[in-house]
């Protein structure tokens, strides 16, 4: 079993935003190495925590790490994608919760495990599946999907400056034979991107790998589905805290929270009494909470992190 050495970002800030009730019911939608789960468990007395992860490695690791809490019925691990939030909780007879935390960063363990195919720094099969039970892999996308579909993925999810060039080069190479490994794909990307652009802005394969990972795991679709359910599951005064690491996710969270906390559109001239049309939710963070300078120095992966929160009225 892989040892989780994942450093949880904005650990205390994300949990503090939930204002934990020791007897409440909580959800960690992204169990990972169990950092947020552990922090919530410390603050619970008779409360319960339901922690989700689609990654079998994370579930097995935390079954050992939190064996006592699981045996005591304080922690329930759920091996599901967080888009199954409502269904999975209903199976546990839970229909309302007091708080939910999301940490949308890919686990360091997933990046650093060369066999998972997430990283352009390790040579491995082009996999990128968070959930090993699913069939779609990055290898399937680059070898079997039409040019226009690959172009759409690179443009939409990678925010790439050269999506057409990369997609075209992938098409040319796969005509000669299948693209099987991460390093094969890295070489193709380097070949596609103009030399001056390769020398700045980080690793040239970064955005392409991000785009493929998001597509393989339908990350944005799953996030939107899950947040929609999470907002409905919140009890009055219940809270959600979300840590994002890239602009696509942050934009989605910001937009969904803004829609839920805005006044409804009303006909012009309609007499409205104060408090008559209050939104059901309020923002806890007008601007996102960012990591401290110390945290960013100690953990460079935290640099892009943003924390947002919302509360049900």
From Swiss-Prot:
Feature: compositional bias, Basic and acidic residues: 297-313
Cross-referenced InterPro entries: RsmH, SAM-dep_MeTrfase_MraW_recog, SAM-dependent_MTases_sf
GO molecular-function terms, A-Z: rRNA (cytosine-N4-)-methyltransferase activity
Gene Ontology biological-process annotations: rRNA base methylation
Protein's cellular compartments: Cytoplasm
GO cellular component, one term: cytoplasm
Region Disordered: start-end pairs: 289-313
UniProtKB keywords: Cytoplasm, Methyltransferase, rRNA processing, S-adenosyl-L-methionine, Transferase
Binding residues for S-adenosyl-L-methionine: 34-36, 53, 82, 103, 110
Reactions mediated catalytically: cytidine(1402) in 16S rRNA + S-adenosyl-L-methionine = N(4)-methylcytidine(1402) in 16S rRNA + S-adenosyl-L-homocysteine + H(+)
Keyword Cytoplasm among UniProt keywords: yes
EC number(s) stated in the UniProt entry for this protein: 2.1.1.199
Chief localisation class: cytoplasm
Family: Belongs to the methyltransferase superfamily. RsmH family.
Described purpose of this protein according to its UniProt entry: Specifically methylates the N4 position of cytidine in position 1402 (C1402) of 16S rRNA.
Protein name (record): Ribosomal RNA small subunit methyltransferase H
Source organism of the structure: Leuconostoc citreum (strain KM20)
Lineage of producing organism: Bacteria, Bacillati, Bacillota, Bacilli, Lactobacillales
């Amino acid at each position: 079993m892989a040892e989780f050495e994942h450093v949880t970002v904005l650990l205390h800030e994300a949990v503090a935003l939930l204002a934990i009730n020791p007897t409440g019911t909580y959800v960690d939608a992204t169990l990972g190495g169990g950092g947020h789960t552990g922090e919530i468990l410390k603050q619970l007395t008779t409360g319960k925590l339901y922690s989700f992860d689609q990654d079998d490695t994370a579930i097995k690791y935390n079954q050992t790490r939190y064996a006592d809490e699981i045996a005591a019925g304080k922690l329930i691990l759920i091996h599901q994608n967080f888009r199954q939030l409502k269904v999975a909780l209903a199976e546990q007879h839970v229909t309302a919760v007091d708080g939910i935390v999301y940490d949308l960063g890919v686990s360091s363990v997933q990046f650093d495990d060369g066999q998972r195919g997430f990283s352009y720094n390790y040579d491995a099969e082009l996999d990128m599946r968070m959930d090993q039970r699913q069939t779609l892999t990055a290898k399937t996308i680059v070898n079997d999907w039409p040019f226009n579909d690959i172009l759409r993925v690179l443009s939409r999810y990678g925010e790439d400056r050269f999506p057409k060039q990369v997609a075209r080069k992938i098409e040319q190479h796969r005509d000669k034979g299948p693209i099987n490994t991460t390093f094969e794909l890295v070489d193709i990307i380097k070949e596609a991107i103009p030399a001056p652009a390769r020398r700045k802005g980080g690793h040239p394969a970064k955005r392409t790998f991000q785009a493929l990972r998001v597509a393989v795991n339908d990350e944005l679709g799953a996030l939107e589905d899950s947040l929609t359910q999470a907002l409905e599951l919140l009890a009055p005064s219940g809270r959600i805290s979300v840590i994002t690491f890239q602009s696509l996710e942050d934009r989605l969270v910001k937009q969904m929270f803004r829609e839920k906390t805005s006044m409804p559109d009303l006909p012009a001239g309609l007499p409205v009494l104060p408090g008559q049309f209050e939104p059901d939710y309020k923002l806890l963070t007008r601007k996102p909470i960012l990591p401290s300078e110390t945290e960013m120095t100690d953990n460079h992966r935290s640099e892009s992190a943003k924390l947002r929160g919302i509360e049900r009225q």
